A protein has these predicted regions:
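Buried hydrophobic residues that stabilize the cores of well-folded domains
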Residues: 21-326
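Bacterial Sec-dependent N-terminal signal peptides
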Residues: 1-25
Length: 326
């Protein structure tokens, strides 16, 4: 049955993305859906073995729910402002160890899902703004991401130094209301490679366009509900595909369901369901009618410490999180 796990991964890594205006403002505890003053989270992944009415940890899985290549691809897409809620949840379930400061910001993260372990160190200024993110392999600096803010506290420039390649520079432009209206990507001394244009209505992002050398290559349209929640997103990669997403929420305005169609085909897309804290519980792939479900066990703080993944009703993975509190 273990082989089915890899089938589910292949289903999940289809190139489907959606953009939604930013999550609730807060620290990394909020971003990760953690409750209480969490000091550290260590995540380990095993194959699940049935043991009576419970499950035991089988052999260790060295990668996460997503393989490294897909995580890198999604991370780059996310830098461009692209989001998909079910991918956003699953991409972070990897063998790792994360440490937080008392303000809820990540200070160090170890990733164990690649050939060599990677240590990522986060540095903040006095206003808790991220100013440096450096990645080390065997104590050697692999990448260095430097963030620079203007006098208004807005992110103005970002320099990504890959060490083995040229630097990539991101510059940000805002309107008088403080809304991001343009972001440029370029290599050092080169003309801009990419340009993003953002358009707002009533403080909500309603249109986003991505240009490469002044040629439109990606477009997004977004609609919101009465409470400002994203209810519809149409993302189009020009001359390639259209992804139509609809979102529903519970009475507390928590995301409940994500319904996705690719190229308007009811046979190509996904249905995802979430718990109140946006933990994924249900993932159905329309093209194969393949169902993945996720069941959790929580600690006393309400944070999940065990997740069992099921594929077509068969338990496949046992994910364990060891959480330490201040």
């Amino acid at each position: 049955m273990k082989i089915k796990y890899f089938f589910c991964v292949l289903l999940l890594i289809v190139s489907v993305y959606a953009y939604a205006q930013g999550e609730a403002v807060g620290n990394d505890w909020v971003a990760m859906g953690l409750k209480g003053k969490v000091k550290s989270v260590k995540t380990s992944i095993y194959f699940a073995e049935e043991k009576g009415n419970d499950f035991a940890k089988g052999s260790t899985l060295s990668q996460g729910i997503y393989p490294v290549k897909k995580i890198k691809q999604y991370s780059e897409m996310e830098r461009m402002g692209v989001k998909a809620f079910f991918i956003q949840f699953l991409v972070n379930i990897i063998p790792s160890a994360i440490t937080f400061d008392k303000n809820g910001f990540i200070t160090e993260k170890w990733r164990y899902d690649d050939i060599f372990p990677k240590k990522i160190v986060y540095t903040y200024d006095k206003k808790h703004r991220l100013i440096d993110k450096s990645t080390f392999v065997h104590e050697f600096l692999e990448t260095k991401d430097t963030l620079i803010y203007n006098t208004k506290g807005q992110l103005e420039k970002e320099v990504l130094d890959l060490k083995t390649k040229d630097e990539t520079i991101y510059t940000y432009t805002y309107n008088i209301d403080g809304e991001l209206i343009q972001r440029n990507f370029k290599k050092v001394e080169d003309l801009p490679l990419f340009k993003e244009i953002y358009i707002y209505n009533n403080k909500r992002l309603v249109n986003k366009e991505l240009y490469q050398f002044d040629q439109l290559i990606w477009r997004g349209l977004y609609e919101y509900g009465a409470e400002g929640e994203l209810i519809k997103a149409i993302s189009q990669k020009i001359d390639d595909f259209i992804w139509h997403s609809k979102y529903t929420y519970d009475q507390n305005n928590h995301l409940k369901e994500e319904y996705l169609l690719i190229n308007e085909s009811e046979k190509n897309g996904f249905l995802n369901r979430f718990g109140s804290d946006r933990r994924l519980t249900y993932h159905l792939t329309f093209s194969t009618n393949y169902l993945c479900e996720y069941k959790y066990t929580d600690d006393k703080q309400g944070n999940w410490v065990k997740m069992i993944t099921y594929e077509q009703g068969v338990p496949i993975l046992y994910v364990e999180r060891k959480i330490e509190y201040f």
